[in-house]
Structures are given as C-alpha cells and as structure tokens.
Design a protein with these regions (language model features):
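Glycine-rich phosphate-binding loop of ATP-grasp-fold ATP-dependent ligases
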Residues: 13, 105-107, 131-156, 176
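Short, glycine-/small-residue-rich phosphate/pyrophosphate-handling segment
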Residues: 89-110
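Short, hinge-like loop/turn segments at secondary-structure boundaries
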Residues: 70, 94-98, 123-126, 150-152, ...
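ATP-grasp fold ATP-binding core
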Residues: 97-98, 124-143, 163-177
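ATP-binding N-terminal substructure of ATP-dependent carboxylate-amine bond-forming enzymes
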Residues: 1-82, 86-88, 92, 111-119
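Phosphate-binding site of ATP-dependent enzymes
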Residues: 149-192
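Structural detector of well-ordered beta-strand residues that form the stable sheet scaffold
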Residues: 77, 105, 133, 167-169, ...
Length: 192
C-alpha cells in the first residue's frame, strides 16, 4: 500500500491509505510504504505481488509511480501511465473531450510567467463572462481552485504563481457528481 508522497495532496493520501488498510488487512497481508527516497529499496525488500496506489496528485496520479512499477513489472491498482498522465493534465483532457464531442467548459491556458492583467481580462471578456474558475493545470482534489469575479481575479491568480501553467475556464453552476468506472462497468454515482 503506497501513500503519502511529496504532492500537495499528501495528507488526503495518508487518510485514504488508512481507510484502505483498515479494509484490506482483514483478508490480505499489507505493508504500508511512503512514497519517499526509500520507495525503490522497499520494493526490492518486500517484493509485493501488487501495489495498491493510494497516492494522490503529483507522482501518484500523473503516471510517474505507474511508470516505475511497470518498469519493475509490478502489478498495481490505478490507470496506466498514459491515461494517468492525460487525466492529470486538464488541458490535454479537455482537448480529448472536445475531439470526442464531450461537452467541457470553455477555457484559456496561461503560462504563469506571462500573466498580463489586461490581456487576461480581455480574453476572458471575449470568451465568457464572470465568474470564472481558475486552477493549476496539473493538480487534483480541488487544490488551489478558485471561483473568481472580475474584482478578485488578479488576487487569486497571484495565489497560483507557484504553478507553471494556469487554466481559466467558464464557471458552470450546478451539482457535482462523480462516477466510478472499473473497466467498462459503472460502479455508481456520488454527489459531492
């Protein structure tokens, strides 16, 4: 059971791992391992049959740990390398959705070193109305996601300065529903 890691989602990963371990230990021998500098040594030492990936965010959901495990020929839970990388990249995902005629909010991608206040506001006004949603392109669990008005846009963009790329998209109000899928089977829908 791999968890923790270095991402902004470390704490939620540890909570996930705690719940997973509680359930799996009833029927399986579990070794919990932090995704840290000793990860490769632990793989060698414990020779796992399968890795349950409880990592969240960078390194855990972006194809990184998956590529390590595939190179070591270790089975794991989670999507594969390419699907993980594409799912974690919000712009790549949106382009795939559009190509497959799946509706997705309109968006603008900005390099953070190229944030020009007037340019951003002009582009937003041209494409859609306020409020807008801003977020880093490669984070999950709603980390650093803001719903912005014209008044607080620049202040919130400043909070995202640590990210290389930022996504600004139209805000669509309503309920948020998550659907789990395993293979081609829908496991159920949950309102968040």
């Amino acid at each position: 059971l791999v968890a923790g890691g270095y991402s902004n989602e470390r704490e939620i990963s540890l909570k996930t791992a705690k719940q997973v371990k509680k359930i799996l230990k009833k029927n399986y021998k579990i070794f919990k391992c932090d995704f840290d500098k000793n990860f490769l040594l632990n793989l060698k030492k414990f020779k796992p049959n399968i890795i349950f990936n409880a990592l969240h965010g960078r390194f855990g959901e972006d194809g990184f740990v998956q590529s390590i495990l595939e190179s070591k020929k270790i089975k794991y839970t989670h999507s594969g390398v390419l699907s993980s990388a594409l799912a974690m990249d919000k712009v790549a995902s949106k382009e795939i959705f559009k190509k497959n005629k799946i509706l997705t909010p309109k968006y603008i991608k900005f390099e953070n070193n190229n944030l020009n206040k007037l340019n951003i506001k002009k582009k937003i006004k041209k494409l859609f109305n306020f409020p807008v949603v801003i977020k880093p392109i490669n984070e999950g669990s709603s980390v650093d996601v803001f719903i912005c008005t014209k008044k607080n846009l620049m202040k919130n963009l400043f909070k995202l300065k640590k990210y290389k790329e930022v996504l600004i998209e139209e805000y669509i109000g309503g309920r948020e529903i998550q659907v789990a899928i395993l293979g081609n089977r829908k496991l159920g829908a949950i309102e968040l």
